[in-house]
């Protein structure tokens, strides 16, 4: 039996792809003419042996629900696995309160009911391939509380401006998580991908709700890094990586992969 279940989270509040996101979730965007963006995180999970996956849907769910169906096209075994779509209860007061923590808290019973000891959390708006089974093994071997995946770039001044960055020490320990403000070109872009125990994940959800209704999972982990309460490690990703955070990044990612050599870094 595999050690972990998967969570595919919806896009953050500050991300908006003009002209497209008003009609469908980013995960439902067409990509390269034959995929949807959400195919990448789900395929990463199923190809890594993760068969129990929760997909969090924030808004405009119809096209996403139609595409995902029962998950059979991802080779999810319906007897041993499940592709579960979960919806959040939106705050009608202000969208600023509709955080990932709020989504998880609204569906806490579904998380608690899962019998796997570890969880892999990935976003629905980033394009990359990786083997999560190796990431989980590295996490367990390190003894860290949380493992975070990052990609080192040299163009952070102009790109990835809606992403987080990781500040690391020499041992790849995470010192802090910050927004990329475009003030340096070399940055470690956080890929919004976490590995941790289910028990710790649930405790972080409760802690974030106690601290602030505005807190995200990244916020509560960042607080733990700064206070020394959490041992958080970074793992570097190799290969193609794109973050779909606006129309330009969506267009550029599609254009990048026309080049066969670039495409090989994603699909090989």
PLM regions with names:
Residues 1-32, 43, 48-50:
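N-terminal nucleotide-binding beta1-loop-alpha1 segment
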Residues 1-10, 18-20, 199, 208-268:
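Left-handed beta-helix
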Residues 59, 196, 245:
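A conserved hydrophobic position in a structured secondary element of the catalytic/binding core
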Residues 66, 73-115:
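Short phosphate-binding loop-to-helix
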Residues 119:
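Short aromatic/hydrophobic "clamp" motif used to bind/position activated sugar donors
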Residues 122-123:
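Active-site acidic Asp-centered loop
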Residues 128-203:
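Conserved core of the sugar-phosphate nucleotidyltransferase
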């Amino acid at each position: 039996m595999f050690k972990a279940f998967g969570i595919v989270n919806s896009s953050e509040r500050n991300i908006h792809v003009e002209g497209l996101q008003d009609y469908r979730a980013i995960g439902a965007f067409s990509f390269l003419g034959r995929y949807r963006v959400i195919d990448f995180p789900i395929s990463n999970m199923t190809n890594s042996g993760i068969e129990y996956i929760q997909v969090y849907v924030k808004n405009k769910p119809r096209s996403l629900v139609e595409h995902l169906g029962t998950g059979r096209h991802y080779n999810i075994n319906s007897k041993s696995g499940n592709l579960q779509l979960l919806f959040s209860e939106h705050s009608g007061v202000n969208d600023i309160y509709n955080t990932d923590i709020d989504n998880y808290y609204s569906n806490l019973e579904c998380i608690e009911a899962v019998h796997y000891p570890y969880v892999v959390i990935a976003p629905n708006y980033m394009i990359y391939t990786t083997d999560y089974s190796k990431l989980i093994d590295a996490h367990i071997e390190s003894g860290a509380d949380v493992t975070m995946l990052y990609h080192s770039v040299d163009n952070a001044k102009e790109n990835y401006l809606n992403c987080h960055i990781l500040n690391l020490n020499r041992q790849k320990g995470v010192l802090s998580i910050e927004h990329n403000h475009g003030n340096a070109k070399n940055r470690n872009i956080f890929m919004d991908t976490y590995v941790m125990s289910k028990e710790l994940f649930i405790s972080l959800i409760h802690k974030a709700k106690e601290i602030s209704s505005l807190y995200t999972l990244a916020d509560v982990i960042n607080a733990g890094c700064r206070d020394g309460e959490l041992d958080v490690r970074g793992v570097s990703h190799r290969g193609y990586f794109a973050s779909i955070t606006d129309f330009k990044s969506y267009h550029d990612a599609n254009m990048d992969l026309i080049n066969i050599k670039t495409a090989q870094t994603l699909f090989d």
